[in-house]
Amino acid sequence: MIKRSVAVVVRGPEAGTFLVVRRPDDPGDPLAGVWGLPAVTLADGEDERAGVVRAGRDKLGVELAPGGRLGQASADRGDYLLVLADYEATIVGGSPSVPQSDASVTQYVEWRYAADPAVLAEAAARGSLCARVFLEDNSKKLPEAERVAAFRRRSGLDTIIDVHTHFMPERLLAAVQAYFDAAGPLIGRPWPITYREDEQTRVSTLRAFGVAAFTALLYPHKPGMARSLNEWGADFAARTPGCLHSATFFAEPSAAADVGRAIEQGARVFKCHLQVGGFDPNDPVLDPAWGLLAEAGVPVVTHCGSGPVAGRFTGPGPIARLLARHPALRLVIAHLGMPEYGEFLTLAERHPGVLLDTTMAFTPFIDDAGAPFPPGELPRLRDLGNRVLLGTDFPNIPYTYADALEALERTGLGQDWLRAVCHDNAAVLFEIPV
């Protein structure tokens, strides 16, 4: 069941102020006694803006004029999925007064105007969606590093571990970014890349965001590339503190030798890109390589979902067949298996060695592309929380790093889930000291 609500950011008489209300000290209420925003649950068929007007009347005793929509978030509340939007509003009649007389709905015991958004921090920490949406909207006015720092504070994270970032030889990176710029056949839509700086600046950017460990995922698009990419990856990891030594392979006779050499050199993660590579993961030429990876227990970040454009060997079927032959593989399903989310969740539920990364999931860019994560699958994703890892696709993303993190926050899966996804699960997987 889906329950929809609206919360109201009532602008105060002085610039930068807004109205906050305090909930009753009800011991059964997780938000008891905290300051938050006035909100109402929408009736069936009720328009959000009509809900804003009703919130003013029922909760504050005033007439409100709805303004702009600040944002939306959702949260699994067990018996229902809560979807909540924040709206700006101004008072056009009356003076605020609490509590109002309707005892059938939550009333408030105190109100005041506040200027500091931090007044809502405790409510956000206790799970208030309306407080979180407001704080996210407010944080977008900050420099990006401060936005990421604010996300980390809200989530209780000292640092972040990102298992899906890309570093590669500059010539290859330029070719990859040119393909994105041209919205090539495997992209399917315009894709304005956010981070185009030189290599050292990109590394420094991640560190400024508090990213303590990250990958340098490489992937060949034709035979004969993997060995040289792996040599570059080994060198990059050796000269870049915090980089998890990354390697790759292709469906070719040298695959097992390439994988074996990379493991001997200390590779800690591999990338397999079935869409770009265009090969079948069940090609017999790959069997020895998969066997080595399974025996070594090295994770393989695998782009196997059919997004943004399907390939000949994408989708859950080829991966299910691969796992039937190599059940010990540690596969990290990139992009949560987008758009076949449910099928890949099923594979993760069946195979304890299968993990998922969050790359691009939940962002407006993906939602607008027609591949949103189904809200009904959020409980399954929550239950797999110890096998979900943060991925971002930095630097080749068409929005900011902060946008990607805040999109995860909007899932409403909670701070424990966020901490596990953005740090703890990867720390365990890669044996990174806390």
Task: Indicate where each model-derived feature is located.
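Conserved, mostly hydrophobic/aromatic
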Residues: 164, 206, 233, 262, ...
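Conserved N-terminal beta-strand and adjoining loop/helix that marks the start
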Residues: 1-19, 41, 72
